[in-house]
Amino acid sequence: MFGYVIADLGRLTEAQRLRYHSVYCGLCRALYADYGAAGALALTYDMTFLTLLLAALYEPEERSGAARCLRHPVRAQQWASSEFTAYAAAMNCLLAWENCRDDWADEKKISAAAAGALLAPGAKKAATQYPEKAAAIRRALGQIAQAEADRTGYSETPANAFGDLMAELFTVRDDRWTDGLRRFARSLGKLIYFMDAACDLQADRKKGQYNPLLLLGIGSGAEFAPQLRLLAGDAAEEFERLPIVQDAELLQNILYSGVWTRFEAAFRPQQEEQA
């Protein structure tokens, strides 16, 4: 379920694009420093959003600079990081490893097994640093796997479990913002779960794999767009309750536009036909 919480680059200003890229590069540097080349290869924009959000909410001291790297050996890239960058890197590594485990369990992909083996040392390190988070991730993914294995009927248990996983990831402190962060992250998690289900619907139907929309009798992922917009509205409502000033427009771009990028790329022709 990686790759949904991304920016709509075409609607960003040049300054916003540079900011987004610098935080992304900062996360990549943290992954490489803490978890090696395998960790850096698991880099996602989803955790870039988490870094931006936590930094916007808590406004910690930030470090920045420019440096070359394996991906950009010629031209130095601007980077920015804060105390939340290392945390997001750890969560990125854990989630990437769990994703490889799930791909191997579900489809026996050799590539997933190989990537998982490379990520395992880093994931173990991250789990040692954040044992409660690692346990929560494993528990939520276990609930999802169990619910998906039980095909007796439609259930929102997997979506709720993924929402709980996101709520745990987004909670880094126990303070007055904790409840709001958890509500927002839970809403975002449910949106991502069902959006992923919509995008995977046809492939899952062909392979005979679990998909909640199949159990609802949905013929095409595009048909589920109205329900997704309701879920997106719930997430947006919770986000707007947070006292976000720093990078507010960038975060809004991701939530209100970027998060739809993959869905619209998959279903735009169908949506235009239905309009």
Language-model segment annotations:
Residues A248-Q252:
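Short, flexible loop/turn segments with low-complexity composition
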Residues N253-S257:
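A glycine-rich phosphate-binding loop feature that marks nucleotide/adenosyl-phosphate handling sites
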